[in-house]
Amino acid sequence: MEMERINDDTIRVTISSDDLNERGVTFLDLLDNHKEIESFFYSVLEEVDTDHQFASNDAVTFQVLPNRNGLELYISKNPTDGMEEAIKSVSKDNAPSNGEMDEVSDFLKRKLAETDSNDKNNDDSSYMSDGNPADLNGYANGVGSTQKSVIELEDFESLPSIAELIKTNSGIESVLYRYHDIYYLELTFFTSENSPETIKNDLAIAYEYGNSTIVSSEVLREHGEVVMDGAALELAKRYFK
């Protein structure tokens, strides 16, 4: 683990995959438990802030960005409006694509901001669509040039398993939701870039690790938690091999 001072108010900590393993922390832990994230970040702060300039500051903030070898954790006190641009500037050499960077960073920031007020207490029956469960011959519930399907995953580990087998390209959008402690994968296929046979084969792969569901995309967008937005398969393939 390496520490670099960016300016008087910001330090960058480079955390490799080996560093995570030594601390018994995985990417899955960081994605699954916001208290685990907070505890891990403060333990890093305690380790690198030997002169206690940051730990004693109530306004300390964390921002995490993935790099090609692990994570970069930025710890700032008295953050300013220009902090984010400074972070992007110093991290650009090691960072993956902007889309990947934003997906992981935004998710971890959302997890840190979670409160108990996010708990869902509504009647489950109001969350369900009126349609029948999807099957491989009825995967098209999209409109126009897209075809959409929602798969209820057996567990989080199902996502990287699916990602390893489905060829990801610009013709598929994938969103991972969590709703009532169950993970759902929404796949949107662009019909101009995928043949009916390709879509059917990809869905067959997905259903090996999940089940059809009557929970609709609309329900997930309104009541669920977005875990990975737009490129869930790509992110899973990159970070959960």
Curated annotation (Swiss-Prot):
Start and end residues of each stretch annotated as Disordered: 115-141
InterPro entries assigned: MecA_C_sf, Neg-reg_MecA
Source species, domain of life: Bacteria
GO MF annotation list: protein-macromolecule adaptor activity
Domain comment (free text): The N-terminal domain probably binds unfolded/aggregated proteins; the C-terminal domain interacts with ClpC.
Job of this protein: Enables the recognition and targeting of unfolded and aggregated proteins to the ClpC protease or to other proteins involved in proteolysis.
Subunit (UniProt): Homodimer.
Family per record: Belongs to the MecA family.
Protein name: Adapter protein MecA
Source organism of the structure: Pediococcus pentosaceus (strain ATCC 25745 / CCUG 21536 / LMG 10740 / 183-1w)
Biological classification of the source: Bacteria, Bacillati, Bacillota, Bacilli, Lactobacillales
Gene: mecA
